[in-house]
Amino acid sequence: MKINSLIAGICLFFSSLFSCQQKGDFKSVSVEDFSTLIANPEIQRLDVRTVAEYSESHIPKSININVLDKTFAEIADSTLQKDKPVALYCRSGKRSKKAAAILSEKGYKVIELGKGFNAWQAAGKEIEH
């Protein structure tokens, strides 16, 4: 019974997160909400920091596309799937908001880690080196 309630709760959470999202909109979420979202294998994980930052450490299973790269949008289009939500982050939340705006304008469903990778690390969440 608890598992059914948990599954129903997760489904409700996802549907409320994406149902009202329009082109150009994205959601900024807390570390805990981001962690819950990326547990879903359908969610694409995107690190928009520099290659050097990504190489130091990152959230497991994240791909890296530097938002400061002039061809960010083109690389994203050739790498990401528009039919699957994108959960993205940067170091502190500034660059990820820029990336989220770009991708959501292109029609992607975007969730952004509001306080970035720094908050993720501070919360003791899993990272890869």
Task: List where the protein language model places each region.
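Start-of-domain marker
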Residues: 37-43
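Rhodanese-like catalytic fold shared by cysteine-dependent sulfurtransferases
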Residues: 2-10, 17-37, 52-85, 94-129
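Short, surface-exposed ligand- or partner-binding patches at beta-edge/loop junctions that are enriched
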Residues: 89
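Short hydrophobic beta-strand that contains or immediately precedes a catalytic carboxylate
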Residues: 44-49
